[in-house]
């Protein structure tokens, strides 16, 4: 049996081989196609034709986007050339007039010498035509420049306003947060201070009394300093003392941890001290009214200082020994009774002393009387007695 060999290439392969071997004489040999980078395409392919068409269209078309303002100005110029020229002339003339009057006002050539007037005329004569030509011939250029400058300025100002508003908002926000934190920290600090002071005063009653007394003294000195510039009388002294004690008690009321019995004790001592001071003031004013006497400023200060010292002493003594002011009338009565009893005993002793002196004098008289009796005996009786 005879083996037959059949070719493995198809008709498509033969066609492609034929096309590859054939060379178009008009178009020339095909360039080699680099399939790696894809930058080179066959010049006769459909893709190459499309790219070439698009590039030609883009090269012949406009490269810039037309400005609407420029288009409108160009349409107005084409449709109304006379009006456009008249407008250019009017703006140029107005610019020249503005330059001329500005120079006239600033220089004022009428007050200058002849040389100054000539120099002004020459300068204006050269400047005004230059301004007129520059504005009239380059009208479109400088109008576009001015419009662009205005646009850039407006955008810049808008950006500045925006940035400033954002910065102010951030500053306000940061400031508000900072102030809120400051208030919070201050409130917490004051609360802790009040708590520490209240707990300390609650745990130490004696320190509480000393603290109250010192605070009261400081407040009294402040009040006396405030009223020192005016005329100080007894009423003001009583008011100062009352306000000082009230301020001290208000300081205590702020410390809410103090027991109620301590507050009750303080109020009771306050009213007792005020009662004693009121009695002193009433008695003093009554005596001054009866004797029609007037105290000068130094006397008022002495009286106020006395009330201040008495009030401090009584309040401090009442806080140290509860009930001392309540027992004071009885103590004063016992003291007066003891004083009067001592006076009576003293006068009795004096009377007894005078009685002893009288007895001694009587004995002396009796002695003198006995001596006189012995001198009256007769001489015969004396001789008989001697013989016996």
Swiss-Prot record:
Q: Which UniProt keywords apply?
A: Cytoplasm, Endoplasmic reticulum, Membrane, Toxin, Transmembrane, Transmembrane helix, Vacuole
The record lists the membrane-crossing segments as 89-109, 119-139, 152-172, 182-202, 207-227, 243-263, 267-287, 297-317, 331-351
Q: Name one Pfam family in it.
A: WTF
Q: Which GO terms describe its cellular component?
A: ascus epiplasm; cytoplasm; endoplasmic reticulum membrane; vacuolar membrane
What's the subunit arrangement here?
Answer: Homomer. Forms protein aggregates. The two isoforms can interact with each other and with themselves. High sequence similarity is required for their interaction.
Q: Which family does it belong to?
A: Belongs to the WTF family.
The entry's protein name is Meiotic driver wtf13
Q: Which organism is it from?
A: Schizosaccharomyces pombe (strain 972 / ATCC 24843)
């Amino acid at each position: 049996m005879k083996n037959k060999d059949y070719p493995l290439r198809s008709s498509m392969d033969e066609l492609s081989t034929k096309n590859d071997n054939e060379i178009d004489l008009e178009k020339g040999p095909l360039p080699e196609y680099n399939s790696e980078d894809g930058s080179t395409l066959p010049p006769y392919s459909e893709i190459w034709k499309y790219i070439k068409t698009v590039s030609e269209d883009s090269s012949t078309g406009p490269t810039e986007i037309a400005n609407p303002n420029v288009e409108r100005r160009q349409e107005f110029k084409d449709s109304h050339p006379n009006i456009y020229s008249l407008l250019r002339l009017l703006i140029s003339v107005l610019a020249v007039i503005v330059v001329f009057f500005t120079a006239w006002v600033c220089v004022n050539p009428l007050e200058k010498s002849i040389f100054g007037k000539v120099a002004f005329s020459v300068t204006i004569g050269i400047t005004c035509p230059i301004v007129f030509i520059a504005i009239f011939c380059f009208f479109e250029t400088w109008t576009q420049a001015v419009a662009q400058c205005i646009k850039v300025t407006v955008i810049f100002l808008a950006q500045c306003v925006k940035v400033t508003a954002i910065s102010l908002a951030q500053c306000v926000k940061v400031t508000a947060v900072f102030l809120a934190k400051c208030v919070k920290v201050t409130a917490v600090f004051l609360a802790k201070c009040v708590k520490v002071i209240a707990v300390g005063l609650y745990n130490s009653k004696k320190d509480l009394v000393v603290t109250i007394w010192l605070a009261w003294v400081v407040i009294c000195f402040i009040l006396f300093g405030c009223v020192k510039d005016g005329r100080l009388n007894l009423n003001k002294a009583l008011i100062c003392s009352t306000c000082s004690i009230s301020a001290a008690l208000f300081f205590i009321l702020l410390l809410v941890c103090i027991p109620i019995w301590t507050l009750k004790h303080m109020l009771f001592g306050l009213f007792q001290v005020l009662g004693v001071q009121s009695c002193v003031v009433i008695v003093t004013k009554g005596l001054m009214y009866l004797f029609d006497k007037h105290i000068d400023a130094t006397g008022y200060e002495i009286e106020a200082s006395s009330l201040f010292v008495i009030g401090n002493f009584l309040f401090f003594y009442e806080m140290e020994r509860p009930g001392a002011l309540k027992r004071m009338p009885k103590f004063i009565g016992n003291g007066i009774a003891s004083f009067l009893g001592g006076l009576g005993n003293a006068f009795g002793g004096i009377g007894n002393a005078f009685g002893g002196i009288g007895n001694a004098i009587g004995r002396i008289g009796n002695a003198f009387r006995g001596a006189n009796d012995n001198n009256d005996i007769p001489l015969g009786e004396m001789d008989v007695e001697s013989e016996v």
